[in-house]
Regions:
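Short glycine-rich, Thr/Ser-proximal phosphate-binding strand/loop in the N-terminal lobe
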Residues: 2-44, 62-64, 82-84, 153, ...
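Conserved beta-strand elements of the Class I
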Residues: 3-7, 129-131, 170, 238
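Short beta-strand scaffold segments in enzyme catalytic cores
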Residues: 14-19, 75, 137-142
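Glycine-rich phosphate-binding/hydrolytic loop that grips phosphoryl groups
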Residues: 19, 110-120, 245, 249, ...
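Glycine/GP-enriched mid-protein hinge/lid loop-to-helix segment characteristic of carbohydrate kinases
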Residues: 30, 37-41, 104-108, 117-210, ...
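Glycine-rich phosphate-binding loop and adjoining helix at the ATP-binding site
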Residues: 34, 39-47, 51, 62-129, ...
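Adenine-nucleotide phosphate-binding core of ATP-dependent small-molecule kinases
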Residues: 35-55, 59-61, 180, 186-238, ...
Length: 305
């Protein structure tokens, strides 16, 4: 069976998979992201992962033959290069750096690709925001059932909206960014925990320091999302990424705080992603299928056995 390679690059984990023509995930692998070892080490790890997944393999008795690669990465991204990533210290890394050239590779923004998968999966809204929250925060802006990239393709950098001017430093160079207060990584770090999940658990058990960090994160999210709502009027805000696993512990207070800030109009619906943590991987699969079509290998629906 012909398939595509999909890799979703996260701040802590590289999620890889082989995706069937119908979008089913046939094979999964995860590897740690060596973020603390420097920009070049992350590029090398991604390149090795691409090479390994690009080899034919037999899964459940079926020979899988990868035909293209989709690579979804964080930061400011074009189809030709990763322009900037605060998480990895990248500047102007060409797409070719992630591959040996054996298969066509499509590079795309992780959140926008995940948003495209979420939009394709449905049901959704004609005007919405897909907001995965993990190591960082960025959004996929959906306007009139289409993803909106902006003038340079960089729309949706919600994680760098200042919610506390002069506040905590952010790797982007600003202070007081939303990501400095409400990303999963910042929540864990500020509460002295390994993961945001640990902070949620402590807060639910009545631990005051953890509850304070969690409340500040929710308030920061509500402030940024109120600003977004007043500008673009979404019908729905979809929370994804690792922090979405908090479920009602996140969604319930966020709905309440968002409604409290939008004093003269109703708040948009806030819900958790239907695709969960697979949205990024499936979005990378869509990138790969597009690359295959551009190489003359067929459209997304033309991949055959």
């Amino acid at each position: 069976m012909t398939c595509v390679v999909a890799i979703d690059v996260g701040g802590t984990t590289l999620k890889g998979g082989l995706i069937a023509p119908d979008g089913a995930i046939l094979h999964r692998e995860r590897r740690p992201t060596p973020r603390t070892e420097g920009p070049d080490r992350v590029i090398a790890a991604i390149s090795a992962f691409v090479a390994d997944l690009s080899r034919p393999r037999t899964v459940a008795g079926t020979l899988l033959r990868p035909a293209a690669v989709g690579l979804a990465v964080p930061g400011l991204v074009t189809s030709e290069k990763a322009v900037f990533s605060a998480a990895f210290g990248w500047r102007d890394v060409p797409a070719a750096a992630f591959s040996d050239g054996r298969l066509p590779l499509a590079l795309g923004h992780d959140v926008r690709s995940a948003g495209e998968a979420e939009l394709a999966h449905g049901p959704g809204a004609a005007d919405a925001l897909y907001l995965p929250i993990g190591t960082g925060i960025a959004g996929a802006v959906v306007l009139s059932v289409s993803l909106y990239g902006g003038a340079a393709g960089w729309a949706g950098q919600i994680g760098h909206i200042p919610v506390r001017p002069g506040g905590l430093p952010c790797p982007c160079g600003q202070r007081g960014c939303l990501a400095a207060y409400a990303s999963a990584a910042s929540i864990a770090a500020r509460a002295g925990e390994t993961t945001a999940e640990d902070v949620v658990r402590r807060a639910a058990a009545g631990d005051e320091p953890a509850a304070r960090v969690w409340a500040e994160a929710v308030e920061a999210l509500a402030l940024a999302l109120a600003t977004y709502t007043l500008v673009l009027d979404p019908a729905m805000i979809v929370i994804g990424g690792g922090l979405s696993l908090a479920g009602d512990a996140l969604v319930a207070p966020l709905r309440a705080r968002l409604a409290a800030r939008l004093t003269f109009r109703p708040a948009p619906e806030v819900r958790v992603s239907a695709l969960g943590v697979d949205a990024g991987l499936l979005g990378a699969g869509l990138l790969a299928r597009r690359a295959l079509g551009q190489q003359g290998g067929g459209d997304v629906d033309d991949l055959g056995a």
